[in-house]
């Protein structure tokens, strides 16, 4: 029965996503422009009130939700990726990489299919979220190998602890897996 189980509202902020363009309705647009493609949690708050743009946005969302007077749990993607909370799910994605690509690739346009990977590495030198094709899976070390267009070199990164993030479709499935949502 629908009401026989306890339920809780969990709100997730996708604050590991790279910002693609400068919102026109915010101050300090030059500050944002120089930080494009970085996770929202790595971009300074253009309003100058919080540590990051994501913290600013997260606080606005929390204030909004409090107005409805119901209990909720608020979680930051950045914190969950970096703390290792998602590591079990990331490993499951890694171990099923080919099967996942076989499901996702037919849903993408031709250009995107050529560069798609469920994993998006975070560039160690620039901090940007990279949308690059994974060249190799290092199965023994649980790392992805890719060509970094910023450094013009082949690099690798661990799939764990916030060194990369997942594309949104795979990210949602991973969250449901880790959180035990059925």
Predicted features, each with a name:
Residues 9-16, 30-92, 102-117, 170-182:
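Conserved alpha/beta enzyme-core scaffolds, especially Rossmann-like or related mixed alpha/beta domains
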Residues 2, 79-80, 99, 129:
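Residue-level preference for alpha-helix termini and adjacent loops
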Residues 14-20, 46-51, 149-158:
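Short, mixed-charge, low-aromatic patches
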Residues 26, 89-91, 140, 147:
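General N-terminal targeting signals
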Residues 21-29:
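Glycine-rich loop at the start of a catalytic domain that most often binds anionic cofactors/ligands
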Residues 96-99, 106-182:
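Alpha-helical recognition segments enriched in aromatics with Gly/Pro capping
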Residues 1-7, 11:
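Single conserved hydrophobic/aromatic residue that forms the stacking wall/gate
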């Amino acid at each position: 029965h629908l009401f026989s189980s306890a339920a809780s509202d969990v709100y997730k902020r996708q604050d590991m996503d790279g910002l693609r363009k400068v919102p026109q309705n915010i101050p300090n647009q030059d500050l944002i422009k120089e930080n494009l493609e970085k996770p929202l949690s790595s971009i300074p708050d253009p309003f100058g009130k919080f540590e990051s743009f994501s913290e600013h946005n997260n606080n606005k969302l929390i204030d909004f939700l409090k107005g409805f007077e119901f209990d909720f749990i608020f979680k930051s993607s950045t914190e969950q990726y970096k703390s290792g909370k998602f590591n079990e799910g990331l490993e499951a994605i890694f171990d099923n990489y080919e099967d996942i690509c076989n499901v996702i690739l037919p849903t993408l346009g031709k250009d995107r299919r050529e560069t798609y990977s469920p994993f998006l590495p975070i560039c160690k030198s620039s901090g940007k979220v990279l949308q690059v094709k994974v060249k190799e899976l290092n199965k023994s070390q649980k790392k992805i190998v890719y060509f970094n267009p910023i450094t013009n070199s082949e690099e690798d990164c661990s799939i764990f602890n916030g060194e990369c993030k997942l594309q949104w479709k795979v990210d949602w499935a991973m969250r449901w897996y880790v959180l035990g949502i059925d």
